[in-house]
Swiss-Prot record:
Major localization class: cytoplasm
An individual GO BP term: lipopolysaccharide biosynthetic process
Gene: kdsB
EC number(s) on file: 2.7.7.90
Similarity comment text for this entry: Belongs to the KdsB family.
Function summary: Activates KDO8N (a required 8-carbon sugar) for incorporation into bacterial lipopolysaccharide in the Shewanella genus.
Name this protein carries in UniProt: 8-amino-3,8-dideoxy-manno-octulosonate cytidylyltransferase
Length: 245
């Protein structure tokens, strides 16, 4: 099975302009993401998907591969679709979508999501990762997307609110969504053509589009958190963790 990992990266950000190139312990953040992803077993190729020459130059500067995408991409999925079209991937090829602001991603988590397709061939077209929340401050923070799934680890819903809600107790596990996806190439094309979902638009969570249109999203529960860098303040947390990793 051919497995291509794509790291979409935008330079523009209202909260953190130039985020992919922000230095963390002497390296741009995108380099940390790329190098950690490259430690995962089972990958055929890794590319950064970007529309910015500054990111392109930085990635090629450390020996990484880049695919340039249209600056008019309306969403992350559109950027992925653009990239895989240029790369000429086949319908049954697997694509892993790893966000460029996850410098603490554990390679084992990437291997875990790939293994779902190896163990359940043809049962679903899309998969993602979850992690049991251990920090109470994340439970009601809309920045941390929560998720619920059935007994077969098929996603039921994603929300910025705390789900599920315990009427009589607070002593139960709550899982957050880690922004890593894997899909077959054919499913990405199908997904990109689906109309915007009502719940997707309400929560501003693109993955809800698949659920609203009746498609399965298989979930793997990771033993490793992968916090995203959203603000310059998050850089300090990453530097501390990477120093002891």
């Amino acid at each position: 099975m051919n497995v291509t990992l794509l790291i979409p990266a935008r330079y523009g950000s209202s909260r953190f302009p130039g985020k992919p190139l922000a230095p963390i312990n002497g390296k741009p953040m995108i380099q940390h993401v790329y190098e950690r992803a490259s430690l995962a077993k089972g990958l055929t190729a890794i590319y950064v998907a970007t529309d910015d020459d500054r990111i392109k130059d930085a990635v090629e500067g450390f020996g990484g591969k880049v695919v340039m995408t249209s600056p008019d991409a309306a969403s992350g999925t559109d950027r992925i679709e653009d990239a895989i079209t240029q790369l000429g991937l086949k319908d049954d090829d697997l694509v892993v979508n790893l966000q460029g602001d996850q410098p603490l991603i554990d390679p084992i988590s990437i291997e875990q999501i790939i293994s779902l397709f190896e163990r359940h061939p043809g049962e679903f077209g899309m998969a993602t990762l979850g992690f049991e929340i251990t920090e109470k401050c994340e439970l009601d923070d809309p920045k941390h997307v929560k998720m619920v799934f059935d007994n077969e680890f098929n996603a039921l819903y994603f929300s910025r609110a705390r789900i599920p809600f315990g009427r009589d107790t607070n002593d139960y596990p709550v899982y957050k969504h880690l922004g890593v996806y894997a899909y077959t190439r054919s499913f990405i094309s199908t997904f990109a053509k689906l109309p915007l979902g009502r719940l997707e638009d309400l929560e501003k969570l693109e993955q809800l589009r698949a659920l609203e249109h009746g498609y399965k999203i298989k979930v793997a529960i990771s033993a490793f958190d992968s916090p995203e860098v959203d603000t310059p303040e998050d850089i300090r947390v990453c530097e501390s963790r990477l120093a002891v990793d």
